[in-house]
């Protein structure tokens, strides 16, 4: 895989230069992860190609598609797929051990409504995801880039929000974000309030309680015990 970069923006959210949003990180796979990659990739893995996907062809049905960017080790994604067999789940992750772990868990769970990719998310969106096709886009706990001088590297920017909007089903699709970094939550709200074609679906304030469909991770549960917050945000595509 060639090296990729993230996008960098100015204070107005305008693209300054392309530095890809995710970098493919190779890592050492455990034997279990390696076996899962070999055994499960033919049925659950999707190779990158500059060609739009046909969701019915990918999953064998017309069920709603939930896409997650950066699923980590995949435990939550597998749990969501197991709990919602009436939906299709599509995960993109650049860390190959995470993809292997996800496939291993998916095999153990016996689910068939999950597909995964190991590639740069922006390239996948640009070349493979059909417009107006996603029921939900999930972005859970992305890199917060804590230092102020690095805030421009955060994936949630106006151009990214527009890219997501184009892929969501009109007047129906949901962009669901979650972060445990309050400053990033505020940044997400600021960007999404500026992004055209969206409406915050929170009934009171900017944030929503953790939805039942998003599993509570071990890391998150530990954070709760220590008094750390987590902010869930949902915006609906309205135009």
Swiss-Prot record:
E.C. number: 2.1.1.33
Any one GO molecular function term: tRNA (guanine(46)-N7)-methyltransferase activity
Reactions this protein catalyses: guanosine(46) in tRNA + S-adenosyl-L-methionine = N(7)-methylguanosine(46) in tRNA + S-adenosyl-L-homocysteine
Residues annotated to bind substrate: 147, 180, 217-220
Active site: 143
A family per Pfam: Methyltransf_4
Pathway: tRNA modification; N(7)-methylguanine-tRNA biosynthesis
Residues that, per the record, bind S-adenosyl-L-methionine: 68, 93, 120, 143
One GO CC term on file: tRNA methyltransferase complex
Coiled coil: none
Keywords, ordered alphabetically: Methyltransferase, S-adenosyl-L-methionine, Transferase, tRNA processing
Family: Belongs to the class I-like SAM-binding methyltransferase superfamily. TrmB family.
Function: Catalyzes the formation of N(7)-methylguanine at position 46 (m7G46) in tRNA.
Identification of the protein by name: tRNA (guanine-N(7)-)-methyltransferase
């Amino acid at each position: 895989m060639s090296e990729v970069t993230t996008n960098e923006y100015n204070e107005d959210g305008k693209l300054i230069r392309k530095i890809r949003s995710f970098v493919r990180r190779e890592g050492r796979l455990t034997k279990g992860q390696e076996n899962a990659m070999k055994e499960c990739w033919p049925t659950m893995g999707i190779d990158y190609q500059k060609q739009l996907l046909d969701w019915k062809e990918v999953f064998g049905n017309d069920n709603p598609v939930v896409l997650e960017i950066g699923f980590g080790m995949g435990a939550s994604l597998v749990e969501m797929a197991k709990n919602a067999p009436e939906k299709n789940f599509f995960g993109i992750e650049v860390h190959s051990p995470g993809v292997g772990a996800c496939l291993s868990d998916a095999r153990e769970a016996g689910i068939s409504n999950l597909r995964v990719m190991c590639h740069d998310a922006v390239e996948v969106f640009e070349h493979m995801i059909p417009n107006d096709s996603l029921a939900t886009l999930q972005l859970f706990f992305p890199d917060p880039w804590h230092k102020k001088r690095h805030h421009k590297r955060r994936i949630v920017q106006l151009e990214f929000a527009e890219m997501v909007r184009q892929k969501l089903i009109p007047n129906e699709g949901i962009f669901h974000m979650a972060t445990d970094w309050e400053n990033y939550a505020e940044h997400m709200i600021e960007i999404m309030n500026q992004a055209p074609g969206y409406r915050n679906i929170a009934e009171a304030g900017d944030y929503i309680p953790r939805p039942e469909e998003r599993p509570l991770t071990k890391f998150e549960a530990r954070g709760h015990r220590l008094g750390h917050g987590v902010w869930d945000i949902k915006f609906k595509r309205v135009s």
